[in-house]
Amino acid sequence: IWWRYTSTLDWFDPVSLACGLLLLAAETYAWLVLLLGYWQTAWPLHRPPAQLPADPAQWPSVDLMIPTYNEDLAIVKGTVYAAMGLDWPADKLTIWLLDDGGRAAFRDFAEEAGIRYVARSTHEHAKAGNINHALKMATGELVAIFDCDHLPTRSFLQMTVGWFYRDPRLGVVQTPHHFFSADPFEHNLQRFRKMPNEGALFYGLVQDGNDMWDASFFCGSCAVIKRTALDEIGGIAVETVTEDAHTSLRLHRLGYTSAYILSLIHISEP
């Protein structure tokens, strides 16, 4: 970058100089972002799970929400069955199937599985609106959110909820997304599970580095959010298409903290 500053600008041609300065400004910005990225991830926190109270009667109630719109029932069933298998007191876990597609087959499946089914007559604000609509009926102390193609492991809640006892100002616990099938690039290049993908960088290092600075954020799925904190910010943010990051910013703005637990406690489709 020093060479660019000292040896590449044409000071005698105004047009070339203007174009060169604009390009140099962009390169300087990229260089600063790179340095900040290295600093941000230099000390990943590697936060361990926190222990729950010994008596399960003291554990909080959880609403686990699975939003869906046009996905096949065969995909959604796997997520529901995995949620039903969570190691958590049955009287403290309510599973919600949030069907923005309003499909009879989904309603029948939810009834057979013994879980709650919610459908909206309107579909404003997409996934965020779907979740906010269900929150009006939910009463749990915590809200766990899973995309309909994400499967929690049996220990998911026991691995995440303990941090809400350790940190009273904790607003959200996020976990990484691990994928059991290849994305299009990995499939076409035949690199699946032979080399890390961009998700491994983000969920394996960037988020863990963010956690060191209390800056990890909600990624839309595979997370647990404190209900009182969610109510305080008016529910899931609906003003942007990145409602997960926007929701995180609102939580942090009100003084809530976030946590990131780098453990394989669910798997996902790409």
Name what the model sees in each region.
Residues 262-270:
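Residue-level detector of conserved catalytic or cofactor/ligand-binding positions
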